[in-house]
Amino acid sequence: MKKYNKLRIEWDCRRGMLELDKIIMPFYLTHFHELTDDKKDIFIRLLASTDLQLFSWFFNLAKSQDVELQMMVEYIQKVQKIIIN
């Protein structure tokens, strides 16, 4: 089991858009500990994306070209019960 810098991850979860703060931080606080190490690594990579990228992915305006990131976005949408038509 890998060790993760929880303070760094929590800091990276803080975004410049309130909409993203309402999605990403609650997911981190509630579900991050349940993820496998591989999925935790993908989540951390997701946090390196820009706010505009994340907004477009979470609100289904675009899809990430990175399959793993897109799968993580869809997983977060599912567990956070985000319904965007």
UniProtKB/Swiss-Prot annotation:
The protein's predominant localisation is cytoplasm
Write out the GO biological process terms.
succinate metabolic process
Gene Ontology CC entries for this record:
cytoplasm
Subcellular compartments: Cytoplasm
Question: Which terms are listed as keywords in the entry?
Answer: Chaperone, Cytoplasm
Family recorded in the similarity comment = Belongs to the SdhE FAD assembly factor family.
What role is this protein assigned?
An FAD assembly protein, which accelerates covalent attachment of the cofactor into other proteins. Plays an essential role in the assembly of succinate dehydrogenase (SDH, respiratory complex II), an enzyme complex that is a component of both the tricarboxylic acid cycle and the electron transport chain, and which couples the oxidation of succinate to fumarate with the reduction of ubiquinone (coenzyme Q) to ubiquinol. Required for flavinylation (covalent attachment of FAD) of the flavoprotein subunit SdhA of SDH and other flavinylated proteins as well.
- Protein name as it appears in the record: FAD assembly factor SdhE
Q: Which organism is it from?
A: Haemophilus influenzae (strain ATCC 51907 / DSM 11121 / KW20 / Rd)
* Gene that this polypeptide is encoded by: sdhE
